Amino acid sequence: MPELPEVETSRRGIEPHLVGATILHAVVRNGRLRWPVSEEIYRLSDQPVLSVQRRAKYLLLELPEGWIIIHLGMSGSLRILTEGLPPEKHDHVDLVMSNGKVLRYTDPRRFGAWLWAKELEGHNVLAHLGPEPLSDDFNGEYLHQKCAKKKTAIKPWLMDNKLVVGVGNIYASESLFAAGIHPDRLASSLSLAECELLARVIKAVLLRSIEQGGTTLKDFLQSDGKPGYFAQELQVYGRKGEPCRVCGTPIVATKHAQRATFYCRQCQK
């Protein structure tokens, strides 16, 4: 599933081609995504794009009359193409732009979303979200406070959007390795110093992935059609049985709430 770095990479890739241009019309080939494509998107016409923003894993296209909210789901990606290129099997939505470009949404598993909001404030998919991990609001003191009475393992707690947004399976595993914290540790057992370290490495891991264009494991592509290159730097995720790059101990894989967790028994305590 595309996580925060992949969504931010998509935002940065499409923004220069959309902001200042006008959506002439939308082409919806298959509106049966995780939620049905909003009716307002079918009717888009002559709408200039004012900004391209991100909240958590949602892309937000600001138009004069409202917002397009896009979620990439499990396998979605956005590409900027030249108008006239024929669609392929899993190309479900196009935004045809006034500058001769097309924003094309591809999603083999159709678990993404294209929604419309007159106002963002209070929209159900954006309500109750925690802070952005790259913001000043997410820090060691905040994390320690939220972990203090939490009798659950730290790994799934990091992936809870009420705590912090956008830290999915890949980056939770990688951040815990970088901090030397075992994913099964109770959140309440973390000291303030450990929370401060963990908050710092989460930011560092996410920023490094954004620099590398995100992580491509299967479906994700950047807006120019290229894969994300952070997969080449993964320390534990997807490396079951391979030697730890630090100590040589074989990487272990377990399941947490049906999600794979990867860690080093020697480096993480």
UniProtKB/Swiss-Prot annotation:
Protein name (record): Formamidopyrimidine-DNA glycosylase
EC number(s) stated in the UniProt entry for this protein: 3.2.2.23, 4.2.99.18
What InterPro entries does the annotation carry? DNA_glyclase/AP_lyase_DNA-bd (IPR015886), DNA_glyclase_Znf_dom_DNA_BS (IPR015887), Formamido-pyr_DNA_Glyclase (IPR020629), FPG_cat (IPR012319), MutM-like_N-ter (IPR035937), Ribosomal_uS13-like_H2TH (IPR010979), Znf_DNA_glyclase/AP_lyase (IPR000214), Znf_FPG/IleRS (IPR010663)
- Gene responsible for this protein: mutM
How many cofactors are bound and how? Binds 1 zinc ion per subunit.
Q: Which GO terms describe its molecular function?
A: 8-oxo-7,8-dihydroguanine DNA N-glycosylase activity; class I DNA-(apurinic or apyrimidinic site) endonuclease activity; damaged DNA binding; zinc ion binding
Q: Which organism is it from?
A: Shigella dysenteriae serotype 1 (strain Sd197)
Q: Name one GO biological process term.
A: base-excision repair
Sorted alphabetically, which CDD domains does this protein's record hold? EcFpg-like_N
